[in-house]
Amino acid sequence: MTPDWHSSLILTAYILIFLTGLPANLLALRAFVSRVRQPQPAPVHILLLNLTLADLLLLLLLPFRIVEAASNFRWYLPKIVCALTGFGFYSSIYCSTWLLAGISIERYLGVAFPVQYKLSRRPLYGVIAALVAWIMSFGHCTIVIIVQYLNSTEQVGTENQITCYENFTQAQLDVVLPVRLELCLVLFFVPMTVTIFCYWRFVWIMLTQPHVGAQRRRRAVGLAVVTLLNFLVCFGPYNMSHLVGFHLRQSPSWRVEAVVFSSLNASLDPLLFYFSSSVVRRAFGKGLLLLRNPGSSMLGRGAEETVEGTKTDRGGSQTEGAQSSDFVTE
């Protein structure tokens, strides 16, 4: 079946997100895994690693969306595949919102209370925060999947064509729409509010401290801007569809396009990784060099780069006031 122009646009967007997001997140994954394996990793690196895993989960499920768009949003796979891919896809989105909030809290505490934070922080705190984000997203999305699985695929029209998560009876909407509203409030507006407050204070401190260099200030502003774009551009339209749907008592017609914007998060997060960690900046630099010189071996130099990156992180962090943080003021 040849996709129409609307499906073709969405198909193109999904393919571009997949092609740009997958290699960038794999590079970031390699960098964060090597960093977390070192003794006493910083909580922020644990959170960034989990954010990378959430992005990769979304990207690995994106081919199902690509196939669906190529089929004019007709679902030809088994019913359970629709339920499981939807569960994983939306869980990764909502896990990302709270992980972003956790990263913003870590950044704010690191610059507002550098000495106290350096003395009190533990890797366990990052693990606990990441687990809470995953449990909250999986738990909430499980509720939606249980409701939607009763109608995860439905016959539409007169040609026995099947769609995935698009058609619901009014009785099902009476359950689904309030749950979506709760998702929007708890897993979007609350973490976005926390993130905006933390980055507002974070950027203000970085810009008003006279001993903070211009490069660190630019990275601080870039980190805040990319995170804000994530919430407003990527997650915003999809969650606004929850509010509009609850008001109209039906899913809005533009919900499919909103889901595409939420997928864009997987391509935007690598920019956040770039501003957040010198390990990732070096990994991206090495990756660009490898693209220019295909004959060189990334794997062959992986261990050497990891050791070098770890030493640089530690040295730079100790100078700035806390291990493994690019933004801790003295």
UniProtKB/Swiss-Prot annotation:
Ranges facing Extracellular side: 1-8, 65-79, 148-184, 241-255
Keyword hit for 4Fe-4S: no
Entry comment describing in which tissues the protein is expressed: Detected in whole wall and separated mucosa in the distal ileum and colon. Expressed by enteroendocrine cells expressing peptide YY (PYY) (at protein level).
Membrane topology, as annotated: Multi-pass membrane protein
Bias kind Polar residues: ranges: 315-330
A GO biological-process term: negative regulation of insulin secretion
Ranges of compositional bias, category Basic and acidic residues: 302-314
GO cellular component, one term: cell projection
Domain of life (superkingdom): Eukaryota
Function, as annotated: G protein-coupled receptor that is activated by a major product of dietary fiber digestion, the short chain fatty acids (SCFAs), and that plays a role in the regulation of whole-body energy homeostasis and in intestinal immunity. In omnivorous mammals, the short chain fatty acids acetate, propionate and butyrate are produced primarily by the gut microbiome that metabolizes dietary fibers. SCFAs serve as a source of energy but also act as signaling molecules.
UniProt record similarity statement: Belongs to the G-protein coupled receptor 1 family.
Protein name per the record: Free fatty acid receptor 2
Species this protein is from: Rattus norvegicus (Rat)
Species lineage: Eukaryota, Metazoa, Chordata, Craniata, Vertebrata
Name of encoding gene: Ffar2
